[in-house]
Amino acid sequence: FTEEIVNLLLHSASEDFDWSDISPTIFGAVFESTLNPETRRSGGMHYTSIENIHKVIDPLFLDELREELEQIKAVKVGKIRTDKAKAYQEKLAGLTFLDPACGSGNFLTETYISLRKLENEAIKLKFGEQIAIDTGDIIKVSIGQFYGIEINDFAVTVAKTALWIAESQMMKETEDIVHASLDFLPLKSYANITEGNALRMDWNEVVPKEKLNYIMGNPPFVGARYMNKEQKDDLLSVFTDWKNAGNLDFVCCWYKKAADFMQNTNIRTALVSTNSVSQGESVANLWKPLFESGTHIDFAHRTFRWDSEANMKAHVHCVIIGFSVAPNNKEKVIYTSDRAQKARNINAYL
């Protein structure tokens, strides 16, 4: 950027704009809208709306956390309720998340905001209408719990910025609850976004698997026939010695990497992908070996039309699949539009 352009952006164009209330998720839409259609198509980049993010994170973990909070609120005895709120806050602070195709960070940012809102509810239970005297350690949840991998260097910067904005905004909400100013230095906290090719990296070097609770995201949408040579090579490096791997869509790589990473852990995963992963050859080529290795589907959103908040929306149909390797006694759920159906088992056709 020339000095003239920088001055135009920072001063003339932004002179009357209040940045304090900007939605961090808007950054994702801005980033995607700067890409030309060919770049977006070849990279399979599609921004995820808040609504679609919650289709992933709500059944993966957020619904359960909300239910637990409501149970704490219902406790009649003040001391017991306060103690449970403290323990709940520590639980939130102990959760760790990975988005291995994080793009501009919308999954991580929205998850951080959702956790901080729950934490603020717990803080309300602890302090009531009192003014906090000791504000040194009120907030436990941090952006350091959120890890991402992204191949595009500019998207990495956008993701870090979005997390910092979210951190600042949620800090203000906490200050309103405790009626006190909290020490906060923006950009001081560390955002764990790693620039690199997630399909060639050892995810354990990004975040140790014994520390991780959840994997989530919206990996690139690139059909088997549309992959470039580099993407094809990446796919074959993930599906070593698999039959008919060349017929799989690019997104299948993240299913395989996640399934491998979850072995011998309690990690749970949920991914958005084109509905091709639950149709035709993918059922035999992807899911049969995954099921044989111990993977099972915990919940699924059947085919829905993709909508995002960016211009030039992706014209695709998607599914969301939650899966894990560890034993899971919870009821399995299939979502169709706004209807939820319980199931004993969910197969690859959903």
Regions found by a protein language model. Give the residues of each.
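Preference for the N-terminal adenyl/adenosyl cofactor-binding alpha/beta module
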Residues: 1-114, 145, 149-158, 162, ...
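Short amphipathic alpha-helical surface micro-motifs
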Residues: 10-13, 29, 79-80, 127-131, ...
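Pocket-edge positions in alpha/beta enzyme catalytic cores
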Residues: 44-45, 130, 134, 207, ...
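Signature of N6-adenine DNA methyltransferases within the class I
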Residues: 51-52, 109, 116, 156, ...
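Flexible phosphate/Mg2+-sensing switch loops adjacent to catalytic phosphate-binding sites
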Residues: 68-93, 115-144, 167-188
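AMP-binding/adenylate-forming catalytic domain of the ANL superfamily
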Residues: 186, 193-194
